[in-house]
């Protein structure tokens, strides 16, 4: 997972979001699939996170999308 210090707050917010929704199988499957996608650029990963969260968690903020995209990067 990315340790990019410029996005530490966003990553922490995304991590908290994942903890709060840890029983959601859709979210867990999405996270698992994204972890092993080595073919994605950051922009691709951000777009997929945005689409997933917009569809399943429309209340999720842009901070969560950005944090999740960085958190899932190696």
Describe the residue ranges of each PLM region.
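Short terminal alpha-helical segments
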Residues: 2-23
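Acidic, low-complexity, intrinsically disordered interaction modules
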Residues: 16-74
